């Protein structure tokens, strides 16, 4: 494969990772064709519009705008030419079942003051936690981000094992520790700890099972802030689609892929569409779920079996999403809100160990009209409610489970967030269940966040962006490195494009060395 190959690079899937890959590759001079099964581009970052209400259907929080800036910079563009980003502060409001509330502020000095009023003595622990989070972020920037990584060996193989500071970095990364233990070693107050635990909800995993390195998310959010794109998070994929079109990418929504084609040496050579058309390609970037890519798009290949044997990947959690169009705004809400469970341990035990919906769940509530009134008719609200649930388990029929669980959710909002009259103000309603998410987005077992980040040692690692088994195949999206969440999915697309471009400029697609087991 060469950069000037007559064959285009194919992108399978038009989610955020696929769109990012397409833009970067096109900006670097590659011919690119993108295939997307759905009639829209953007994957989970879709939109629902009805009766004067507009809802972001998937992600609602934009963090790390530096990732987006990097993608647009590939084409010599500035992000503000495409997006109008508004900084949100407070970043979240937390509601507890004892009637107290706590705002998460971006500026540490303001947060220290909040904490010392809320839980005297917690400010110093939070300050130390942020210092530790910043160290973890520095290590992530050095070894983990913007490179194809599938294991701890990949993190360090580009660096001498005897390089200065390596041992210190290995110690500071907190291997063998969980997010929950790290948080509580700094901030023992249970309510403050519950707030900090929820940084891991960006990756759909239990803080008790996730590696401490994910505490770095706190620094990332404090450093770069939380942002809202006017027009909703749907504006992000629309901006990428606009950039891709300007760069000459051949965008094909409504064109699903049946399988990825390989030659006798199991090198990716093209795709077969669901209509039966076979298209030769210089290389393939799969923005489909990485496990389903191997099970379905590469079914029958030796590589599929190797992928499954290398490591047992578990789906991240799923969720129930309620889209409620209201004729009322709730003044106690800010843009982003967490309505917390009474007992976090019992909640996570239900979701991640028992595989059942939590009887007393935490509800994430997005009330965007405070920032963009146009999302609803005057005086109204386009309320988005997300409650994490287990990924799909055998025997779970969400068409029967949803009505009862909807009542649980609304009762939680009434008892803990004071939304006692919510039912009477609903003028429009829609929803997604784990089964809907599984069917709509073709993800593993209805997982919202790709693969779980569980495991105190290997939990941070997802499949590498350069396939270990199939030359010419690259992986992007929330189930590939560096993992789930809006900025990470975008970064995965950049990485997949970057390593593909490196291989193209070298004139060959070489099979990478085997990654050692963790």
PLM regions and their residue ranges:
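Helical element adjacent to the flavin cofactor pocket in flavoenzyme catalytic cores
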Residues: 216-268
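Mid-domain catalytic core of redox enzymes
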Residues: 249, 258-377, 517
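A glycine-rich dinucleotide-binding beta-alpha-beta segment and adjacent secondary-structure elements
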Residues: 189-203, 360-366, 419-482
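Active-site-proximal substrate-binding core of FAD-dependent oxidoreductases
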Residues: 262, 501-518
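Rossmann-like flavin
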Residues: 97-209
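A conserved FAD-binding loop/helix module that cradles the flavin
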Residues: 59, 478-500
């Amino acid at each position: 494969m060469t950069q000037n190959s007559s064959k285009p690079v194919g992108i399978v899937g038009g989610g955020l990772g696929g769109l990012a890959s397409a833009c970067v590759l096109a900006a670097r001079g590659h011919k690119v064709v993108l295939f997307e099964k759905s009639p829209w581009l953007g994957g989970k970052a879709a939109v629902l519009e009805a009766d004067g209400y507009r809802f972001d259907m998937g992600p609602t929080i934009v963090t790390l705008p530096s990732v987006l800036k990097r993608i647009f910079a590939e084409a010599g563009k500035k992000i503000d030419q495409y997006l109008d980003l508004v900084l949100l502060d407070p970043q979240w409001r937390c509601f507890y079942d004892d009637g107290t509330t706590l705002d998460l502020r971006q500026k540490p000095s303001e947060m220290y003051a909040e904490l010392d009023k809320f839980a005297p003595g917690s400010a110093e622990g939070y300050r130390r936690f942020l210092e530790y989070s910043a160290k973890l972020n520095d290590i992530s920037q050095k070894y983990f981000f913007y490179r194809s990584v599938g294991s701890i060996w990949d993190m360090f193989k580009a660096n001498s094992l005897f390089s200065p500071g390596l041992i210190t970095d290995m110690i500071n990364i907190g291997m063998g520790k969980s997010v929950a233990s790290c948080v509580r070693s700094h901030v023992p107050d249970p309510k403050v700890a519950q707030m900090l635990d929820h940084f891991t909800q960006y990756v759909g995993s239990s803080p008790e099972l996730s590696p401490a390195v994910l505490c770095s998310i706190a620094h990332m959010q404090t450093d770069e802030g939380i942002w809202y794109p006017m027009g909703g998070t749907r504006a992000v994929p629309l901006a990428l689609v606009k950039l891709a079109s300007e760069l000459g990418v051949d965008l094909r929504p409504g064109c699903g892929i049946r399988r990825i084609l390989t030659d006798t040496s199991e090198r990716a050579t093209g795709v077969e569409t669901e209509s039966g058309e076979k298209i030769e390609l210089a290389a393939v970037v799969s923005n489909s779920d990485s496990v389903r890519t191997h099970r379905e798009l590469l079914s029958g290949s030796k590589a599929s079996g190797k992928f499954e044997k290398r490591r047992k990947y578990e789906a991240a959690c799923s969720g129930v999403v309620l889209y409620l169009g209201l004729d009322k705004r709730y003044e106690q809400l800010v843009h982003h809100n967490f309505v917390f469970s009474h007992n976090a341990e019992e909640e996570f035990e239900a979701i991640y160990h028992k595989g059942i919906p939590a009887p007393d769940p935490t509800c994430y509530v997005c009330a965007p009209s405070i920032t963009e009134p146009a999302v609803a008719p005057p005086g109204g609200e386009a309320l988005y409610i997300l409650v994490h649930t287990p990924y799909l388990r055998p025997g779970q029929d969400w068409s029967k489970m949803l009505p009862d669980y909807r009542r649980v959710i609304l009762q939680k909002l009434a008892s803990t967030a004071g939304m006692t009259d919510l039912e009477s103000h609903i003028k429009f309603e829609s929803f997604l269940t784990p089964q809907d998410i599984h069917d709509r987005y073709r993800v593993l077992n209805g997982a919202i966040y790709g693969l779980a980040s569980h495991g105190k040692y290997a939990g941070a690692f997802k499949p590498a962006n350069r396939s270990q088994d199939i030359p010419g195949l690259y992986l992007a999206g929330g189930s590939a490195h560096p993992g789930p969440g809006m900025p990470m999915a975008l970064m995965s697309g950049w990485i997949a494009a970057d390593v593909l471009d490196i291989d193209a400029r070298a004139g060959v697609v070489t099979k990478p060395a085997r990654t050692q087991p963790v």
